[in-house]
Design a protein with these regions (language model features):
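Conserved small-residue
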Residues: 1-275
Length: 275
């Protein structure tokens, strides 16, 4: 049974435009009211950027499959569910037409200054994939069984204490952080909301040294976070809607056909048994 669903629970810290105060909101609330928030306002900017990329992944996935009205593009075949599963991708011959339609979608949503309801419909259809704690699909994680089955016998994955995940503390087991904002056992105490934010941050910035080591003959390789590898830059708008939409790239500006027509494959749509 899953616990702490990120679609429903309040875990993303935002800065309100009207009051200038911060509050925690759920994924669904954020997309429904993005224009009411000034910006993401987590513990630090590197965390905000990591979470921003998850939000952009949702928007890119949805609006490369359907337009601003929630209708599938005529060059792509989707299943009949709100999951918007791609059954047949865009043929390269229609790349120009598809790109033009993506441009129209971007303009339509920008002018409306709000995200269409199809975003939340899509997320709700994948509700079971957004549990932070779950036996089958823990968000941004793999299950213990999924990991152990791929490791050499007797080997385990790296263990992380809360004080290591929380980069406001960043304390290892053999070196104490003297000036940490909390002390003693409190260093490893985290709420589910904090855990969700720092987990996404860790996955974005982690290097290979802290990853589980796979056997040499395995197909899996140690991987580092994209943000650790390439860094990043983004445009900031007057509110969170503008920031999100200005950074949503529905097609490649350099006429990269492969980028434009290849279906997005976010981690929450992944089926562990098919890896």
């Amino acid at each position: 049974m899953g616990r702490y669903n990120l679609l429903d629970e309040k875990w993303i810290t935002v800065l309100r435009k009207d009051s200038g105060e911060t509050e925690n909101v759920s994924l669904l609330t954020l997309f429904e009211h993005a224009g009411e928030y000034r910006a993401l306002a987590g513990e630090m900017e590197v965390q905000n950027f990591a979470i921003l990329r998850v939000l952009l992944a949702v928007l890119t996935t949805v609006f490369t499959r359907v337009d601003a009205t929630g209708e599938a593009y005529e060059w792509i075949e989707l299943d009949d569910s709100d999951k918007l599963i791609v059954e047949e991708a865009v043929d390269e011959a229609y790349e120009d037409d598809f790109t033009e339609a993506l441009e129209d979608t971007w303009k339509d949503i920008w002018e409306s200054h709000c995200f269409p309801s199809v975003v939340c419909q899509y997320l709700k259809a994948w509700h079971d994939r957004f549990y932070l704690l779950d036996d089958k699909y823990p968000f941004f994680q793999v299950t213990k069984k999924d990991l152990v089955d791929r490791l050499p016998k007797g080997k385990n994955g790296t263990q992380f204490a809360g004080k290591q995940l929380n980069r406001m503390i960043s304390e290892s087991n053999n070196k104490e952080a003297i000036f940490a904002p909390v002390a003693g056992q409190g260093k490893s105490h985290m709420t589910e909301a904090e855990l969700a934010r720092w987990l996404i941050t860790m996955q974005g910035y982690i290097g290979t040294a802290d990853k589980a080591k796979f056997p040499k003959e395995s197909k899996e390789k140690d991987s580092k976070g994209w943000l650790y590898d390439i860094g990043g830059i983004y445009m900031a708008g007057e509110d969170l809607f503008e920031t999100l939409w200005m950074n949503t790239m529905l097609y490649h500006i350099e006429d990269d056909v492969r980028y434009t027509i290849t279906p997005q494959s976010p981690c929450w749509e992944d089926i562990p048994s098919e890896r």
